[in-house]
Amino acid sequence: MQQLNPSEISEIIKGRIDKLDVTSQARNEGTVVSVSDGIVRIHGLADVMYGEMIEFPGGVYGMALNLEQDSVGAVVLGAYTTLAEGMSAKCTGRILEVPVGKELLGRVVDALGNPVDGKGPLNNTETDAVEKVAPGVIWRKSVDQPVQTGYKAVDAMIPVGRGQRELIIGDRQIGKTALAIDAIINQKNSGIFCVYVAIGQKQSTIANVVRKLEENGALANTIVVAASASESAALQFLAPYSGCTMGEFFRDRGEDALIVYDDLSKQAVAYRQISLLLRRPPGREAYPGDVFYLHSRLLERASRVSEEYVEKFTNGAVTGKTGSLTALPIIETQAGDVSAFVPTNVISITDGQIFLESAMFNSGIRPAVNAGVSVSRVGGAAQTKIIKKLSGGIRTALAQYRELAAFAQFASDLDEATRKQLEHGQRVTELMKQKQYAPMSIADMALSLYAAERGFLTDVEIAKIGSFEQALIAYFNRDHADLMAKINVKGDFNDEIDSGMKAGIEKFKATQTW
């Protein structure tokens, strides 16, 4: 047997080491290691980027969300039943994009922008990235133009401006969606384009919303993005970003748009599901650590941008116009608990909230807006002049009424001033009630507020406030159409309008026809 010299052994090893090729090889293709619950683990995708689209056999796509040392965790967009262990996965070098443009108006699409309304393919070629960086501070402009929701309670006390983020928060089944849908219906003649994003809702509910928008003539002005409860968690997580990109198309071209996210609680639940399946460490209420960033990067994209931004974006094609994207995110609370994790996050991100209360809804006050805890942080500057002038005492009257009503339960005899204040509060509360799918014009709203502010409701029975208001508005639209048209066009409040309203209401009250 031949004996090897130790020095020879070391020479052989050195030679082998020198010949070894240790240069790293970039690989564009990997192998599926495991598939479960819409999550795919892939080995060998060395140069994949976060958020990049990954192509699987059969035209199925995924999105890279976890970049680990020896594998990539990706979420499948759509059905994952055709995928199996051992299949190949390729990098595409692209991030997720969805179709954008005016061709989407009047259509219902899924989270990836595919039409689901049976009206044929989309006739557009333009696409844009789902994840985009929000405009910087320099490119933004302050909010000073109103978005009329058509609700007295909102437009008078919690006004919303173009480019604002106003949260609608409350328990289930108390009119959150109804308020948002009415706001969309009210935009059909305002020139504001609308996007309605349905996240994790029943398909029957989404179909009902689409039907109501069509019946009220607002669908032609609206894009509906639907990620129903039967869709995968990945599509429910992506739907708000897709809708936001579609809304930004209008903002960046000097138009105004309104987007409703219904609702972000379900998006957070979908994201929690994805994160737990990706084995990310859970935090409070089992949500991942970046659930705040999930909503902040979405809602920061709603903004009012300057003329310079629009001009730069359109390469000078549009000049002298600002663009805006107004967001109405909806959050569902559990038994009125606004201190839960997701509600507190979204309250801190948005520019105010409209708080809907179960007790008010159940007592027949609809919309059930609690004026005491609802606030609009930037909308005051955007409020129409006449509404701002006439709504000053409304909020105070309601706040004082709620406080006095609590004490009045224990007091047996009340002084005259307190009794009058209580009665005025009851009348204002009654006046704030409004039927669904019946948004009001600025002139109609101003007339109601004027009657309350100037004491014309004092001798009207509380039970007849609603019929009095309807008859008064009908009378003014018939006999004082010029005055109403002037208010709707300009929104100003002057002595001429003041005296015209006063004389008209006095004349109407003399007829006693309500």
UniProtKB/Swiss-Prot annotation:
It is an enzyme of class 7 (translocase). It is found in: Cell inner membrane. GO terms for molecular function: ADP binding; ATP binding; proton-transporting ATP synthase activity, rotational mechanism. It holds the Pfam family ATP-synt_ab_N. ATP binds at residues 170-177. CDD domains: ATP-synt_F1_alpha_C (cd18113), ATP-synt_F1_alpha_N (cd18116), F1-ATPase_alpha_CD (cd01132). GO terms for cellular component: plasma membrane; proton-transporting ATP synthase complex. Keywords: ATP synthesis, ATP-binding, Cell inner membrane, Cell membrane, CF(1), Hydrogen ion transport, Ion transport, Membrane, Nucleotide-binding, Translocase, Transport. F-type ATPases have 2 components, CF(1) - the catalytic core - and CF(0) - the membrane proton channel. CF(1) has five subunits: alpha(3), beta(3), gamma(1), delta(1), epsilon(1). CF(0) has three main subunits: a(1), b(2) and c(9-12). The alpha and beta chains form an alternating ring which encloses part of the gamma chain. CF(1) is attached to CF(0) by a central stalk formed by the gamma and epsilon chains, while a peripheral stalk is formed by the delta and b chains. This is ATP synthase subunit alpha.
